[in-house]
């Protein structure tokens, strides 16, 4: 799957994280 920054960020925020970033085409969530 291709990681889309906007989608990833929104997804992470919905799950209670502060932000999301694409790393090696994977969505990673960050609490800060």
Curated annotation (Swiss-Prot):
An annotated Gene Ontology molecular function: potassium channel regulator activity
Site (Aromatic residue of the functional dyad): 30
Disulphide-bridged cysteine pairs: 3-22, 8-27, 12-29
Secreted keyword on record: yes
Annotated tissue distribution: Expressed by the venom gland.
Site feature (Basic residue of the functional dyad) residues: 21
Signal peptide residue numbers: none
UniProt entry tagged with the keyword Disulfide bond: yes
Keywords per UniProt: Disulfide bond, Ion channel impairing toxin, Neurotoxin, Potassium channel impairing toxin, Secreted, Toxin, Voltage-gated potassium channel impairing toxin
Identification of the protein by name: Potassium channel toxin alpha-KTx 10.6
Compartment list: Secreted
Role according to the record: Blocks human voltage-gated potassium (Kv) channels Kv1.2/KCNA2 and Kv1.3/KCNA3. Does not block human Kv1.1 at 100nM concentration.
A GO term from the CC aspect: extracellular region
Species in which this protein is naturally found: Centruroides bonito (Scorpion)
Family (UniProt): Belongs to the short scorpion toxin superfamily. Potassium channel inhibitor family. Alpha-KTx 10 subfamily.
């Amino acid at each position: 799957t291709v990681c889309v920054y906007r989608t990833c960020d929104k997804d992470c925020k919905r799950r209670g994280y502060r932000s999301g970033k694409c790393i090696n085409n994977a969505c990673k969530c960050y609490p800060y």
